[in-house]
């Protein structure tokens, strides 16, 4: 990082997580998350009573039980792996300060930025850990960054990396994780790429997320196409985690798994390239819930391929992404 000022920091931002696998902690987290107009666009007078008097009392205990099934000794998997990724990137960016925060929950973005400013940081490269841009995720981080930038005035310069859905090093890292899985377990009958869904109305309103998912899947499949015995036709892209009654991006992951089982498909490998690190949606929804659903529908085995987490290829790819952004900024300074 020769030539870069030591007053520069990298801020990794992930979605967020409850502080504990308990109903009160989950309710606090979901309340903050579901109050974001980027996540739920209903009018506040209609949404807030529904959220606080119906959804949170019902979902709090249910979601807490799901978290309890995947909770790690060090805390929430999402927090543990995000911290590990920040540490791995710090080793690769020794002249910078690498920190991490959550959009919802703790550590809050505002608190981490305040701490960085107290350390003398004057430039912050914000890297939302969402490979694909969406108004429901990345734009919400950008909203907070805009508020923090207004508060900081000229004291801090913010620079956000909006997406990296076809970054060659990231694509190679995901493809490499799939190859490692195949080397240990062999290939399944199908390779399913499962992304978090968004409401179809947002896609209709030109949210780039569906196109980013498709482009990323195609790039990863192309990287795997050189492997002997892999047929790109075995790859399927789906969307998971829908919430509410309105249509979301399709095909749905759960419906696809049931359909594959009905067609006689016995084994499925599932990878989730929309998630930088493992979390509730991968470890519980895919690895436990959807694996059981696939077996109940007649399939034999759903093998979940872990997220990149704090792996060397992941840290290498994101550190290189940061380097390029910093050098591009220095060239135009």
Model-derived regions, located:
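Active-site-proximal alpha-helix that buttresses catalytic centers in soluble enzyme cores
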Residues: 1-333
